[in-house]
Amino acid sequence: MWGVGLLAYAVAVFHRSSLGVAAVEAQERFSAGASAVSLFLVLQLAVYAGLQVPVGVALDRFGSRRMILAGAVTMAAGQLVLALATDVPTAIAARVLVGAGDAMTFISVLRVVSFWFPGPTAPLVTQLTGILGQIGSIVAAYPLVTLLHATSWAATFAGAAATGVLVALLVLLALRDAPEGTPRPTAVGLAELRRGLVDTWREPGTRIGLYTHLVTQFSGTVFALLWGYPFLVIGQGLAPGTAAALLSLLVLVGMGVGPVLGRLCARWPLRRSVLVFGILAATVTVWTVVLLWPGRAPLPLLVLLVVVLGTNGPGSMIGFDFARTENPAERQGSASGVVNVGGFVASLLTILAIGAVLDVLTPGASADYDLAAFRAAFSVQYVFWAIGLVGVLRHRRQLRERLARDGVVLQPLHAAIRARLAGDAPAP
């Protein structure tokens, strides 16, 4: 069951990423500037983020199979519309469909994981889902780009639509929501639905999950979905093949890091925020060095940037683990939906801001951005890193205060490490 869901998610990531690797061709096809092209993706992500809570509620009611099936069909329709589009409004409508279908997929697959892999294996399988699903990005970075250059825009995106139809058929025939004997969800009234959503939001575990997802995810997402490729090719002067290889490296790093983070979360669940802070510190540090580097950054530094960004996706999965452990089973869908809003809202706002800054600093409708424009544009990330950090710190404090009331007092990390090295009883 998990394999079918994983394939559906990988294809959703492929659909989501397909425009990013074709950003330059999109500007040429639609005679659009950076702001217009970024608007395609911003609206796609806005729809994705805006539907997370409604999809989460529907998921708790209808189950994963129906939601994943609906998502696959909707994304296939969006790619077909994009294949035929010749103007900006039609292209925007196409990406809105892709965003709507994408919104139905990931948290539905996470619900499959929660039912088929209960207990301590769930964090690891959640990480594997998020990371192996990024294979779709590799398919977008290599086969899709190759097909786009060898054939045409219409043929490439029509092929993407056909892939979505095949996935929908597989889900229809092979996927089940939960093992036999699992109680089916029941319909609830509007008042009970509203009360459940309020309880989900009031839970500090949901909110720390949201801010964890925000602060760890958006930089890597922005880089992989749209602005990384132009930054590497136009801003840093890399060959297109080298840039595509770096985007693939980002995914491969995540595949390696994800299982490690999953095991660490399962082993030390009360220290998950330490992993979040470590990923954030590494991301901010390497971006600062790249943006302040005089002239174009050397290739090893860009490789380091991509390696660090590769940890962002796995880091954001920790947010779902917070929501999973702090919410009851009947609220898993809505809690995951709330968490998933964080990173994608930050991503879409960052994508839009980067496009706007590039257009302001670049005359006319030219896509020939200089390095100074890219530096200014990518600096908007610091705003969202600050917002996310404050949110994580605030809600971590609330969770730890609740633990203290329950008799669980966490030692400072340095004291816990010192105690473990001294051979004393391990602290939580």
Predicted regions and their residues:
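Helix-to-loop junctions at the C-terminal end of transmembrane segments
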Residues: 51-63, 257-271
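Conserved MFS/SLC helix-loop-helix module at the cytosolic interface between two early adjacent transmembrane helices
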Residues: 50-89
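Extracytoplasmic gate region of multi-pass secondary transporters
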Residues: 19-20, 204-258, 350-355
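Helix-loop-helix hairpin linking two adjacent transmembrane segments in secondary transporters
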Residues: 128-179
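Juxtamembrane intracellular "pre-TM" segments in multi-pass secondary transporters
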Residues: 178-210, 409-424
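Cytoplasmic helix-loop-helix junction between adjacent transmembrane helices
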Residues: 94-133
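Helix-breaking motifs and short loop linkers at transmembrane-helix boundaries and internal kinks
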Residues: 31, 63, 84-90, 101, ...
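Cytoplasmic membrane-interface "Motif A"-like loop-to-helix N-cap segments
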Residues: 61-71, 266-281
